[in-house]
Amino acid sequence: MIRDLSKMYRRRAHPAPHQPAQPFKFTISESCDRIKEEFQFLQAQYHSLKLECEKLASEKTEMQRHYVMYYEMSYGLNIEMHKQAEIVKRLNAICAQVIPCLSQEQQQLQAQHLLTWTWSACASDTTPLGFSQPFHPSGSSAGLLALSSALGGQSHLPIKDEKKHHDNDHQRDRDSIKSSSVSPSASFRGSEKHRNSTDYSSESKKQKTEEKEIAARYDSDGEKSDDNLVVDVSNEDPSSPRGSPAHSPRENGLDKTRLLKKDAPISPASVASSSSTPSSKSKELSLNEKSTTPVSKSNTPTPRTDAPTPGSNSTPGLRPVPGKPPGVDPLASSLRTPMAVPCPYPTPFGIVPHAGMNGELTSPGAAYAGLHNISPQMSAAAAAAAAAAAYGRSPVVGFDPHHHMRVPAIPPNLTGIPGGKPAYSFHVSADGQMQPVPFPPDALIGPGIPRHARQINTLNHGEVVCAVTISNPTRHVYTGGKGCVKVWDITDPGNKSPVSQLDCLNRDNYIRSCRLLPDGRTLIVGGEASTLSIWDLAAPTPRIKAELTSSAPACYALAISPDSKVCFSCCSDGNIAVWDLHNQTLVRQFQGHTDGASCIDISNDGTKLWTGGLDNTVRSWDLREGRQLQQHDFTSQIFSLGYCPTGEWLAVGMENSNVEVLHVTKPDKYQLHLHESCVLSLKFAHCGKWFVRPGKDNLLNAWRTPYGASIFQSKESSSVLSCDISADDKYIVTGSGDKKATVYEVIY
């Protein structure tokens, strides 16, 4: 533009002699106008280019979206091709067995027909995608595998095992081509007989094994509840009580060895909790009617067909783990992708990886972390993993592969308090700010604070112990298992047999909760049945004096009012039933939970009730007015809760292994992250200064109220499912998955 101006000035200067100042001023003004016009033109051009750039950016985004969509389709087709290839191989093997039984003429005729069909099938399958494969006697399987390899190569998903598998298939097919040049029928018979003697025999054995596993896994809970309740302890440590933590109360940290520990995968057939899924054959609990998968949401549950059912004191039930359909297992190696790492813990009671204090996971399942804040480069791989589950993986029904990712991420700046160990207790303010808790000097010392717990007795119940309770004064322990409650006298450590056995419910139904009235003369029992049994313990021989029948197929937890006049039962349909114990009638139902009500506790003055449910909510109820007071929404199912006797704090145990201690009148709360599994039960000491929390990780932990300093920890040989504390806070009883209850003496 400057050169143009100089030319303009030169052209105007030479034709005529220089005039007075007026023409010169006119030239400058004209030049300024021209500059202004050119600037406006450039500005308009810039604006146009900017709009075009934005349009291209939006088109790029749209193309990326289409790419991901087509990637999913391609990957799904790839998996479908693998499935079809496997079907073809098996059909070929069957034909190879059947054809030799025919006459010679029929053998040749059928072999020719089979070859024709194989060629046409191969051509029709590969042509639409632009792939052409040479003719093979077993060309369908080879062509399909080659197509799968090509598709996989485009998506960068096949791994070394797949390539090796493909190479072996191609080599075998090339060998079959050479033999086919002599006699198609003879080569077909020879190659298929050879395959029959090797591949088909192994495939048939594998298929039979899979069918047996499926039959065993899909058997009804009513018939297989024993198997479903066996806890896999083959890779767990033996029982060894632990003393107080070595770190000082101000450290608020974990041992590094505990953070670095990796839990061995448990068998899908093994289950962690005593509270099995209620018998689908006879009960049809709300477990199967309207359960929810706890996802990151506040209050809208997502229906599913097999959520866990909680047990006594929020002891969760178990989700049956179906086997893989026949024909899918041989494809497993072909379907593995870097993003589709199989989770070794298929049920909500699998040991949940403990979140590091900066949000990372310390288990093999951590590969799923990238799926939650996934980069654009990995979006296609995530879509491929989703497609794998949709098309070929046949994932476990209701399986939530990200259940361990629901642990709230902890910001990197909250990794710990000075001292070098990561924090496990955090204070969450009203505005959501998380800060590690500096424990006070008296966190682990002082009146009413125990030093450790010593195991003094083992009660061999013989069945998985889902519910326990201690009498007041401390003399008898009641353990609830399968179809009965056993009564133990713990004042005589040498007595290894129960003093009585109370048969209730049906023989195959598990007791989920048992509660003693304050006078110790009446026991109320509930579980996987629609009836509650009321036992008269004061009679010469304990007997059932009444039964309360509700419309719900199961009761998960019980609470008794302080005046012993009213019983509250958590029903599998989400309702809270209120029973008049004197008249033995149903007087009211609190309705609010959209899924099974799993746990319950009542205030000391008997005016307020707290309930937790599988709908990810905790609700409080005014017992005088019969209405709901508050609702707290969480991102995980609620398995247990406890109301502090002092009346200020409510502790909530969740499926995602967190414990949250809420203030009942203020928005402040504490989050505790020390455990590595779902919180199956929770109980406050009667002094209110500490509470215990057993779990699937075989640990019994004692915490300081409310900030959660770890007081002591005891290791058991199996999952700890239920617990109770004596009225004098001197004894703790736990029920576990290895068919026993353990009595601890609390040492102060």
Swiss-Prot record:
WD repeats lie at residues 460-498, 506-545, 550-589, 592-631, 633-672, 674-713, 715-748. Residues 250-427 are annotated as: SP domain. The keyword Transcription applies. It comes from the Eukaryota. The modification N6-acetyllysine is found at residues 212, 256. The modification Phosphoserine is found at residues 183, 187, 191, 197, 220, 225, 240, 244, 248, 267, 296, 298, 394. Residues 1-20, 157-332 are annotated as: Disordered. GO terms for cellular component: beta-catenin-TCF complex; nucleus; transcription regulator complex. Residues 113-179 are annotated as: GP domain. The keyword Nucleus applies. Its main location: nucleus. Residues 1-112 are annotated as: Q domain. SMART domains: WD40. Homooligomer and heterooligomer with other family members. Binds PAX5, LEF1, TCF7, TCF7L1 and TCF7L2. Interacts with ZNF703; TLE4 may mediate ZNF703 transcriptional repression. Interacts with SIX3 and SIX6. Interacts with PAX2. WD repeat Groucho/TLE family members are characterized by 5 regions, a glutamine-rich Q domain, a glycine/proline-rich GP domain, a central CcN domain, containing a nuclear localization signal, and a serine/proline-rich SP domain. The most highly conserved are the N-terminal Q domain and the C-terminal WD-repeat domain. Belongs to the WD repeat Groucho/TLE family. This is Transducin-like enhancer protein 4. The lineage of its organism: Eukaryota, Metazoa, Chordata, Craniata, Vertebrata. The gene is Tle4.
